[in-house]
Amino acid sequence: MWVLLPGLVFAADTKPPAEEGQDHQQDLAKAVQNPVAALISVPLQDNVDLGVEPGDRVRNTLNIQPVVPLPLTRDFNVITRVILPILYQPDLGDGEGGTFGLGDTSATFFLAPKKPGALIWGIGPAFLLPTATNEVLGTGKWSVGPSVVALIQPEPWSIGVLANNVFSVFGGDDRATVNQLLLQYFVSYNLPKGWYLTSAPLLTANWEAPSGEKWTVPFGLGAGKVFTVGKQALNGSVSAYYNAIRPDLPGAAEWQLRIQLSFLFPLKKKH
């Protein structure tokens, strides 16, 4: 039998209930740090960008990002990751007001082995779909490109990287060409009782931007905990990141506060 991660086995009636509960929290913490784990999750991630220029404004993005593993063959799963962003974008012209609505939807499909070795990996296509409800909230382009994830989980660490680069393939001729890299490295250190320390900054590069203005590179740290409310497993975390490298262009932010609550649904093999 596997629960959460392939090959993870629980022995019955060998530990007190309190210890079993703590072990379950630890196992869940490791699973949520693995983007291609056999775990359905529905994260609600709120990103508050502070110091948005010009005018030292505030931008808010709520990402609804369900992750669902689907069996493909005896040896492989397809991990579907969708991000639906709900944004408030401040008006960067007159410094007052802003626009609220849905942004462009991203969808990634990772082919990942059900029983990986020490190196856990996934590879597949990434799509950026022009679902924005206002032109200032999206690109107006259909974009596609490759995506890859790789990680290792030596106790008590989880260390990995997730990256994709999408290119616009068609869309409005009056909209800018899309050629952008998203790269997220993640390092987590697991503590007792489901607690963990984490750093998972999101680095981006807009290859169409002027020279010297392409990269946004944040650094920061956060903490989180896996816990249960009734029978529902949850993962909550808070992180803060400083954009040490950022373009000197309208819309660039100085800081980001990230608050996330994930609903977790561990998969169990049916007998």
Predicted regions and their residues:
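Bacterial N-terminal signal peptides
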Residues: M1-G7
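Transmembrane beta-barrel domains of Gram-negative outer membranes and organellar outer membranes
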Residues: A12-H271
